[in-house]
Amino acid sequence: MIQPQTHLNVADNSGARKLMCIRIIGASNRRYAKIGDVVVAVIKEAIPNTPLERSEVIRAVIVRTCKELKRDNGMIIRYDDNAAVVIDQERNPKGTRIFGAIARELRQLNFTKIVSLAPEVL
């Protein structure tokens, strides 16, 4: 469960390392974000000499959460960290590589470019 002020790892090579969620896109007063939700975040830590800088406000999609994800077939998936991928206004990833496993649910949410770049889809 991701809520405002939650710190996230970045699962791509866009240049950001750590994000902090500041708003959940969707309903006006949603409290928590889950896998596949788009959030507004601020960059807390960035790699030097990259296009993204610290304190820049960006959008990101959640790809991993520590909170369990329950599927219709009864399977429960839980990750070790909270992670997101930086996206642009057209919902395409800003990076060219994705690190770590991501959930299959992103394919149904039309994040097919992220799914195709991922090394492992659970």
Swiss-Prot record:
Q: Where in the cell is it found?
A: Plastid, Chloroplast
- Which superkingdom? Eukaryota
Biological process per Gene Ontology, one example term: translation
PROSITE patterns reported in the protein's UniProt record: RIBOSOMAL_L14 (PS00049)
Q: Can you name a GO cellular component term? A: chloroplast
Q: Which UniProt keywords apply?
A: Chloroplast, Plastid, Ribonucleoprotein, Ribosomal protein, RNA-binding, rRNA-binding
Predominant location: plastid
Q: Which GO terms describe its molecular function?
A: large ribosomal subunit rRNA binding; structural constituent of ribosome
Summarize subunit and interaction data from the UniProt record for this chain. Answer: Part of the 50S ribosomal subunit.
| Reported function | Binds to 23S rRNA.
What is the protein's given name?
Answer: Large ribosomal subunit protein uL14c
**Native organism:** Morus indica
